[in-house]
Amino acid sequence: MAQENKQNSRTAEHLTFKLDQFEGPLDLLLHLIKQNEMDIYDIQVAEITSQYIDYLHQMQDLRLDIAGEYLVIAATLLNIKSKMLLPVEQEQQVEEDYVDPREDLVQQLVSHQLYQEVAAKFHVMEKQRMELFSREQAVNEDVTYEVSEGTTIDLLQKAFAKLMARKKVKKIKKIKRKIIPERYTIKEEIENIEHTLKMHKGTMNFTDLFDFDGEVEVEKVVTSFLALLELVRVGRVSASQEENNGPILMTYEGKAEEDAI
Protein backbone atom coordinates (compact mmCIF):
# COMPACT_ATOMS: atom_id res chain seq x y z
CA MET A 1 0.00 0.00 0.00
CA ALA A 2 2.84 2.37 0.90
CA GLN A 3 4.51 1.66 -2.44
CA GLU A 4 1.23 2.34 -4.29
CA ASN A 5 0.76 5.65 -2.46
CA LYS A 6 4.33 6.58 -3.29
CA GLN A 7 3.73 5.80 -6.96
CA ASN A 8 0.48 7.80 -7.00
CA SER A 9 2.28 10.70 -5.36
CA ARG A 10 5.02 10.55 -7.98
CA THR A 11 2.39 10.44 -10.72
CA ALA A 12 0.60 13.46 -9.28
CA GLU A 13 3.83 15.45 -9.40
CA HIS A 14 3.84 15.09 -13.18
CA LEU A 15 0.16 16.10 -13.53
CA THR A 16 0.81 19.82 -13.28
CA PHE A 17 -0.60 20.76 -16.69
CA LYS A 18 -3.91 22.52 -17.26
CA LEU A 19 -7.00 21.61 -19.26
CA ASP A 20 -6.53 24.44 -21.76
CA GLN A 21 -3.19 22.97 -22.82
CA PHE A 22 -5.02 20.24 -24.72
CA GLU A 23 -7.47 20.31 -27.62
CA GLY A 24 -9.34 17.33 -26.18
CA PRO A 25 -9.00 13.95 -24.46
CA LEU A 26 -7.07 12.37 -27.35
CA ASP A 27 -4.55 15.19 -27.13
CA LEU A 28 -4.14 14.46 -23.41
CA LEU A 29 -3.73 10.72 -24.07
CA LEU A 30 -1.03 11.37 -26.67
CA HIS A 31 0.76 13.57 -24.15
CA LEU A 32 0.68 10.82 -21.52
CA ILE A 33 1.85 8.20 -24.02
CA LYS A 34 4.81 10.35 -25.09
CA GLN A 35 5.62 11.29 -21.49
CA ASN A 36 5.79 7.60 -20.56
CA GLU A 37 7.74 6.78 -23.75
CA MET A 38 5.20 4.15 -24.79
CA ASP A 39 4.62 2.69 -28.24
CA ILE A 40 1.30 4.08 -29.49
CA TYR A 41 0.49 0.61 -30.87
CA ASP A 42 1.20 -1.14 -27.56
CA ILE A 43 -0.32 1.12 -24.91
CA GLN A 44 0.07 0.02 -21.29
CA VAL A 45 -3.60 0.58 -20.56
CA ALA A 46 -3.47 0.08 -16.78
CA GLU A 47 -0.78 2.72 -16.29
CA ILE A 48 -2.27 5.22 -18.74
CA THR A 49 -5.76 4.79 -17.27
CA SER A 50 -4.43 5.43 -13.76
CA GLN A 51 -2.68 8.64 -14.84
CA TYR A 52 -5.66 9.79 -16.90
CA ILE A 53 -8.07 9.31 -13.97
CA ASP A 54 -5.60 11.04 -11.63
CA TYR A 55 -5.60 13.97 -14.03
CA LEU A 56 -9.40 14.22 -13.97
CA HIS A 57 -9.37 14.03 -10.17
CA GLN A 58 -6.87 16.86 -10.11
CA MET A 59 -9.20 18.95 -12.25
CA GLN A 60 -12.06 18.20 -9.84
CA ASP A 61 -9.89 19.19 -6.86
CA LEU A 62 -9.24 22.51 -8.58
CA ARG A 63 -13.00 22.82 -9.10
CA LEU A 64 -12.63 23.04 -12.87
CA ASP A 65 -15.38 21.86 -15.19
CA ILE A 66 -14.51 18.68 -17.08
CA ALA A 67 -15.89 18.38 -20.59
CA GLY A 68 -18.07 15.35 -21.26
CA GLU A 69 -15.70 14.06 -23.95
CA TYR A 70 -13.00 13.59 -21.28
CA LEU A 71 -15.37 11.44 -19.24
CA VAL A 72 -16.28 9.38 -22.33
CA ILE A 73 -12.62 8.53 -22.92
CA ALA A 74 -12.23 7.74 -19.22
CA ALA A 75 -15.07 5.22 -19.49
CA THR A 76 -13.51 3.81 -22.67
CA LEU A 77 -10.16 3.32 -20.93
CA LEU A 78 -11.79 1.58 -17.97
CA ASN A 79 -13.71 -0.69 -20.34
CA ILE A 80 -10.54 -1.63 -22.23
CA LYS A 81 -8.70 -2.20 -18.96
CA SER A 82 -11.42 -4.56 -17.71
CA LYS A 83 -11.38 -6.54 -20.98
CA MET A 84 -7.62 -6.92 -20.86
CA LEU A 85 -7.82 -8.25 -17.30
CA LEU A 86 -10.05 -11.11 -18.44
CA PRO A 87 -8.23 -14.40 -19.13
CA VAL A 88 -7.84 -15.15 -22.83
CA GLU A 89 -7.41 -18.68 -24.11
CA GLN A 90 -4.09 -19.20 -25.88
CA GLU A 91 -5.85 -20.58 -28.96
CA GLN A 92 -7.99 -17.47 -29.17
CA GLN A 93 -4.92 -15.23 -29.14
CA VAL A 94 -3.59 -16.74 -32.36
CA GLU A 95 -6.89 -16.72 -34.23
CA GLU A 96 -7.21 -14.29 -37.12
CA ASP A 97 -10.50 -12.90 -35.80
CA TYR A 98 -9.05 -11.96 -32.41
CA VAL A 99 -9.58 -8.24 -31.84
CA ASP A 100 -7.31 -6.30 -29.51
CA PRO A 101 -9.55 -4.24 -27.15
CA ARG A 102 -7.22 -1.29 -27.76
CA GLU A 103 -7.61 -1.31 -31.55
CA ASP A 104 -10.35 1.32 -31.95
CA LEU A 105 -8.67 3.69 -29.50
CA VAL A 106 -5.30 3.26 -31.23
CA GLN A 107 -6.85 4.12 -34.59
CA GLN A 108 -8.42 7.26 -33.09
CA LEU A 109 -5.05 8.27 -31.64
CA VAL A 110 -3.21 7.63 -34.92
CA SER A 111 -5.78 9.69 -36.84
CA HIS A 112 -5.56 12.52 -34.29
CA GLN A 113 -1.76 12.44 -34.38
CA LEU A 114 -1.88 12.62 -38.16
CA TYR A 115 -4.06 15.72 -37.98
CA GLN A 116 -1.48 17.28 -35.65
CA GLU A 117 1.38 16.49 -38.04
CA VAL A 118 -0.45 17.95 -41.03
CA ALA A 119 -1.47 21.05 -39.05
CA ALA A 120 2.13 21.54 -37.89
CA LYS A 121 3.38 21.39 -41.49
CA PHE A 122 0.76 23.93 -42.57
CA HIS A 123 1.83 26.20 -39.70
CA VAL A 124 5.49 26.03 -40.77
CA MET A 125 4.57 26.70 -44.40
CA GLU A 126 2.39 29.65 -43.37
CA LYS A 127 5.20 31.10 -41.25
CA GLN A 128 7.70 30.73 -44.09
CA ARG A 129 5.28 32.32 -46.56
CA MET A 130 4.79 35.34 -44.30
CA GLU A 131 8.53 36.03 -44.53
CA LEU A 132 8.42 36.21 -48.34
CA PHE A 133 7.53 39.25 -50.43
CA SER A 134 6.67 38.93 -54.10
CA ARG A 135 5.16 41.03 -56.84
CA GLU A 136 1.50 40.35 -57.43
CA GLN A 137 0.74 38.84 -60.82
CA ALA A 138 -1.82 40.36 -63.11
CA VAL A 139 -5.18 38.69 -62.65
CA ASN A 140 -6.41 36.78 -65.68
CA GLU A 141 -10.18 36.90 -65.28
CA ASP A 142 -10.64 34.26 -67.98
CA VAL A 143 -8.75 31.61 -66.00
CA THR A 144 -10.01 30.20 -62.72
CA TYR A 145 -8.73 27.23 -60.76
CA GLU A 146 -11.03 25.50 -58.33
CA VAL A 147 -11.55 22.10 -56.82
CA SER A 148 -14.69 20.34 -58.03
CA GLU A 149 -18.06 21.60 -56.80
CA GLY A 150 -18.81 20.49 -53.26
CA THR A 151 -15.18 19.57 -52.54
CA THR A 152 -13.31 21.69 -49.99
CA ILE A 153 -9.83 21.54 -48.50
CA ASP A 154 -11.41 20.53 -45.20
CA LEU A 155 -13.19 17.59 -46.86
CA LEU A 156 -9.94 16.54 -48.54
CA GLN A 157 -8.16 16.60 -45.17
CA LYS A 158 -10.92 14.49 -43.59
CA ALA A 159 -10.76 11.98 -46.44
CA PHE A 160 -6.98 11.85 -46.06
CA ALA A 161 -7.20 11.17 -42.32
CA LYS A 162 -9.89 8.54 -42.94
CA LEU A 163 -7.56 6.83 -45.42
CA MET A 164 -4.89 6.48 -42.72
CA ALA A 165 -7.30 5.52 -39.94
CA ARG A 166 -9.18 2.82 -41.84
CA LYS A 167 -6.20 0.44 -41.79
CA LYS A 168 -6.22 -2.22 -39.11
CA VAL A 169 -3.68 -1.84 -36.32
CA LYS A 170 -1.48 -4.62 -37.68
CA LYS A 171 -1.32 -2.88 -41.03
CA ILE A 172 -0.85 0.52 -39.45
CA LYS A 173 2.28 -0.83 -37.83
CA LYS A 174 3.80 -1.02 -41.29
CA ILE A 175 3.64 2.76 -41.55
CA LYS A 176 6.93 3.65 -39.93
CA ARG A 177 7.92 6.99 -38.48
CA LYS A 178 11.52 8.02 -39.01
CA ILE A 179 12.99 11.37 -38.03
CA ILE A 180 15.09 12.02 -41.14
CA PRO A 181 15.36 15.70 -42.18
CA GLU A 182 14.29 16.43 -45.76
CA ARG A 183 13.80 12.80 -46.69
CA TYR A 184 10.81 13.83 -48.75
CA THR A 185 10.17 17.28 -50.14
CA ILE A 186 6.99 18.84 -51.49
CA LYS A 187 8.77 19.74 -54.73
CA GLU A 188 9.82 16.12 -55.34
CA GLU A 189 6.33 14.81 -54.53
CA ILE A 190 4.77 17.36 -56.90
CA GLU A 191 6.95 15.99 -59.70
CA ASN A 192 6.08 12.43 -58.65
CA ILE A 193 2.31 13.11 -58.67
CA GLU A 194 2.41 14.80 -62.09
CA HIS A 195 4.55 12.02 -63.58
CA THR A 196 2.33 9.28 -62.12
CA LEU A 197 -0.85 11.00 -63.32
CA LYS A 198 0.53 11.17 -66.86
CA MET A 199 1.34 7.45 -66.69
CA HIS A 200 -2.29 6.79 -65.66
CA LYS A 201 -3.79 8.85 -68.52
CA GLY A 202 -4.31 11.87 -66.29
CA THR A 203 -6.68 10.42 -63.68
CA MET A 204 -6.15 8.28 -60.57
CA ASN A 205 -7.01 8.02 -56.87
CA PHE A 206 -4.66 9.56 -54.33
CA THR A 207 -4.36 6.19 -52.56
CA ASP A 208 -2.92 4.62 -55.73
CA LEU A 209 0.27 6.60 -55.14
CA PHE A 210 1.18 4.19 -52.33
CA ASP A 211 1.61 0.47 -51.83
CA PHE A 212 -0.14 -0.14 -48.49
CA ASP A 213 0.73 -3.84 -48.69
CA GLY A 214 4.36 -2.86 -48.22
CA GLU A 215 6.04 -0.29 -45.98
CA VAL A 216 4.72 3.27 -46.28
CA GLU A 217 6.11 6.03 -44.10
CA VAL A 218 3.77 8.65 -42.65
CA GLU A 219 6.21 11.37 -43.75
CA LYS A 220 5.84 10.20 -47.36
CA VAL A 221 2.03 10.22 -47.26
CA VAL A 222 1.78 13.60 -45.49
CA THR A 223 4.26 15.24 -47.88
CA SER A 224 2.39 13.82 -50.89
CA PHE A 225 -0.88 15.20 -49.54
CA LEU A 226 0.66 18.67 -49.11
CA ALA A 227 2.02 18.40 -52.67
CA LEU A 228 -1.49 17.60 -53.93
CA LEU A 229 -2.93 20.65 -52.15
CA GLU A 230 -0.24 22.81 -53.76
CA LEU A 231 -1.02 21.42 -57.23
CA VAL A 232 -4.73 22.08 -56.66
CA ARG A 233 -3.92 25.63 -55.52
CA VAL A 234 -2.03 26.50 -58.72
CA GLY A 235 -4.50 24.70 -60.98
CA ARG A 236 -2.25 21.98 -62.37
CA VAL A 237 -4.33 19.22 -60.76
CA SER A 238 -7.99 19.10 -59.76
CA ALA A 239 -9.32 17.00 -56.88
CA SER A 240 -12.83 15.64 -56.45
CA GLN A 241 -14.86 13.20 -54.36
CA GLU A 242 -18.03 11.30 -55.22
CA GLU A 243 -19.07 11.51 -51.57
CA ASN A 244 -17.92 13.21 -48.36
CA ASN A 245 -14.86 11.46 -46.91
CA GLY A 246 -14.72 9.30 -50.03
CA PRO A 247 -11.60 8.52 -52.10
CA ILE A 248 -9.77 11.56 -53.50
CA LEU A 249 -9.77 11.47 -57.32
CA MET A 250 -6.92 13.45 -58.91
CA THR A 251 -7.11 14.76 -62.50
CA TYR A 252 -4.16 16.31 -64.31
CA GLU A 253 -5.07 19.70 -65.79
CA GLY A 254 -1.69 20.58 -67.32
CA LYS A 255 0.49 23.60 -66.78
CA ALA A 256 -0.97 26.64 -65.04
CA GLU A 257 -0.02 30.30 -65.04
CA GLU A 258 1.43 30.09 -61.53
CA ASP A 259 4.29 27.75 -60.70
CA ALA A 260 4.03 25.45 -57.71
CA ILE A 261 6.62 25.36 -54.93
From Swiss-Prot:
Pfam families: SMC_ScpA (PF02616)
Keywords for this protein: Cell cycle, Cell division, Chromosome partition, Cytoplasm
One CC-aspect GO term: cytoplasm
Disulfide topology: none
GO BP term, example: DNA replication
Superkingdom field: Bacteria
Cellular location(s): Cytoplasm
Role, per record: Participates in chromosomal partition during cell division. May act via the formation of a condensin-like complex containing Smc and ScpB that pull DNA away from mid-cell into both cell halves.
PANTHER family per record: SEGREGATION AND CONDENSATION PROTEIN A
Family, similarity comment: Belongs to the ScpA family.
Oligomeric and partner information: Component of a cohesin-like complex composed of ScpA, ScpB and the Smc homodimer, in which ScpA and ScpB bind to the head domain of Smc. The presence of the three proteins is required for the association of the complex with DNA.
Record-given protein name: Segregation and condensation protein A
Name of the gene: scpA
